[in-house]
Regions:
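Short, solvent-exposed turn/loop segments enriched in Gly/Ser/Thr/Pro and often Arg
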Residues: 44, 165, 208
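Terminal-tail/helix-coil boundary detector
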Residues: 206-218
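GST-like domain detector, emphasizing the conserved glutathione-binding G-site
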Residues: 1-133, 140
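A generic structural-conservation signal
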Residues: 40, 91, 162, 204-205
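Active-site-flanking alpha-helical
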Residues: 83, 173-174, 205
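GST-like fold's C-terminal all-alpha helical module
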Residues: 107-197
Length: 218
């Protein structure tokens, strides 16, 4: 019996600035690293997806994933599910494994919000009178968070020793680092380059880009 491929929700139509940055890229990247095939359920970012989709993804966002009878939403949860199911992208040693899981949550809870608030002000409200001042006020906190990541990474190539779902999540945040604050830390600049040079990342991003159609709202 042939196993069904997992299906991930993704956008087929987004503004130009979002191309190559939408969060389904994280899941595509993990699946490419694992050598697992998948299908996409494409949606329109410009319009509400409707009640049927909201039962799958309560916040009407992407990604969500359906794998057989299992439905999951939130990119961190999907990454953890895939790593545990396929026994890949998580270290085997308990200490390293839990370090990877801790860094997965740290990326989502301690680093991403600091970068996202800058992106929101600079990209979505860039024409507002208050935008520049808000961005400058937010920068020190984001820089401090990134400095902590750099210090923890140190001379290691990856956060938990070997490449893991934590690195997929952390590195993907730098795609939306509109001020390129991570590049102020030489350790993170090199880390970012290592991550984005991986063939699986490049395949995942190419696949996401191939799914996009027009950028303009109908």
């Amino acid at each position: 019996m042939t196993a069904t491929k997992p299906t991930i929700s993704a956008f087929g139509k987004v503004p130009e600035f979002a191309k190559g940055r939408v969060r389904d890229l994280r899941i595509r990247w993990a699946l490419e690293e694992m050598g697992e095939e998948y299908e996409t359920h494409l949606l329109d970012a410009y319009h509400p997806r409707g009640p049927e989709y909201v039962t799958w993804q309560p916040f009407d966002q992407v990604p969500a994933m359906r794998d057989g009878d299992i439905e999951i939403f939130e990119s961190g949860a999907i990454l953890l599910y895939l790593a545990e199911k396929h026994e890949k992208l998580l270290p085997a040693a308990p200490q390293d494994r839990w370090q990877a899981i801790a860094w997965l949550f740290a990326a989502l809870n301690s680093v991403e919000p600091a970068l996202n608030q800058i992106t929101t002000a600079a990209v979505f409200h860039g024409e507002a009178d208050w935008s520049d001042g808000a961005v400058e006020a937010m920068k020190p906190f984001a820089q401090q968070r990134l400095k902590r990541v750099a210090e923890a990474l140190g001379e290691k190539d990856w956060l938990a020793g070997e490449f893991s779902i934590a690195d997929i999540l952390m590195a993907s945040l730098f795609l939306n680092d509109v001020l390129e604050l991570a590049n102020e830390q030489p350790v993170l600049k090199a880390y970012r380059a290592r991550a984005f040079e991986r063939p699986a990342f490049q395949r995942a991003r190419a696949a996401q880009m191939a799914d996009f159609t027009d950028s303009e709202e109908d």
